[in-house]
Amino acid sequence: MDRIRIVGGNELNGIIPISGAKNAALPLMIASLLTSDTLTLENVPHLADVELLMRILGNHGVDVAVNGRRERQEDSYARTIHFTCRTIVDTTASYELVSKMRASFWVIGPLLAREGHCRVSLPGGCAIGTRPVDLFIEGLTALGATMEIDAGYINAKAPDGGLIGARYTFPKVSVGATHVLMMAATLARGTTVIGNAAREPEVVDLANCLNAMGAKISGAGTSTITIEGVTSLSGARHRVLPDRIETGTYAMAVAMAGGDVVLENTDVALLDTALETLRRAGADISATNNGMRVRRNGAGIKPVDIVTDPFPGFPTDLQAQFMALMTRSSGISHVTETIFENRFMHVQELARLGARISLSGQTAKIEGVERLRGAPVMATDLRASVSLVIAGLAAEGETTVSRVYHLDRGFERLEAKLTRCGAVVERISE
């Protein structure tokens, strides 16, 4: 099992190219099930989750072709991948594959819309809370589907003639459920109105792609999305938007380690709240032609309280990274997690590096320390794993992060991107 070794104490200086967003690429790939034509996606990151989803889609009949020549972006690679599903050959998504990645459960929407029936295993993925499927079931039921849970699977069936447009309001904001209901509604009869919809940029990106395929979607990016059903969708060519979570992660790494880094191929507008929070913590952030420049001013790291919220609030996927930054602040800060109920598993690992963090319910109190000291630590989930890397960049001595397969699910060539900016980071394969 691979480990990441970090020798702390080096500033970051240079250029880091930002990859395509994993959280956008996955639903876009799944949307290929909605058409018999070819969907071409550009700027697809090379990640474990992407590779796994390609296997899952292949089982359903999607032919996947990766361009032989990759678009070289310094130490990152933006791939162009063609997805063609002439015929859906299997409407069952097995436990063996779905249990490995929660997002693969989202095939339930396109399979139900195109074939009228499917059998999909209940999902797996990061162990950061229950993340129930109730919202998915209720939303699809509103479109006329019958849903039955049997032996760990959901058996879903559309009414004769296909799904029927309806008005449905989510009781709680859910990005995944918004993706699924929006995809399913594109082929439903009539008009669907989704209330309390997720407003994340990745939802907008999916809507833009679906519209390019012939869907009629309006309101994406607001809390009300309207979809006028069409009889079929065609192929399209679409570029995956930049990864705002990767962008924020590297910005926090610079704030933690110090230095001067330009983040290329990204957009400051994707994460206004997080960047404003970083500025309050002492980072100097300015927009460039195709990204941003991040520096840490001489005042050090200031304590800042945050509360995670759905977009446009502070992203839960940056919570662990920000907590790592606050361990070196000049005072006391608080991090409150409102999205997931079990997303503080990185706390005990940060404590191994010398962090002072106490928990009270869904709030963590962080007392900044003068220094962190390297130690062996263990990744518990995707975002927690990179928070340990960020802490290791500023820790004295050597930090080793084990179970980095979590890291490979969401960060493309992290060691290479940090190393080219002066960090001492290496992967140790065993």
From Swiss-Prot:
Classification via InterPro entries: Enolpyruvate_Tfrase_dom, Enolpyruvate_Tfrase_sf, MurA_subfamily, RNA3'P_cycl/enolpyr_Trfase_a/b, UDP_GlcNAc_COvinyl_MurA
Record carries keyword Cell division: yes
Source organism of this protein record: Rhizobium etli (strain ATCC 51251 / DSM 11541 / JCM 21823 / NBRC 15573 / CFN 42)
Listed name of the protein: UDP-N-acetylglucosamine 1-carboxyvinyltransferase
GO cellular component: cytoplasm
GO molecular function: UDP-N-acetylglucosamine 1-carboxyvinyltransferase activity
Alphabetic keyword roster: Cell cycle, Cell division, Cell shape, Cell wall biogenesis/degradation, Cytoplasm, Peptidoglycan synthesis, Pyruvate, Transferase
Pathway as given in its UniProt record: Cell wall biogenesis; peptidoglycan biosynthesis
GO BP, one annotated term: cell division
Enzyme class: transferase
Role, per record: Cell wall formation. Adds enolpyruvyl to UDP-N-acetylglucosamine.
Compartments reported by the entry: Cytoplasm
EC code: 2.5.1.7
Binding site for phosphoenolpyruvate: K22, N23
HAMAP family assigned: MurA
Catalytic reaction list: phosphoenolpyruvate + UDP-N-acetyl-alpha-D-glucosamine = UDP-N-acetyl-3-O-(1-carboxyvinyl)-alpha-D-glucosamine + phosphate
Modification sites for 2-(S-cysteinyl)pyruvic acid O-phosphothioketal: C126
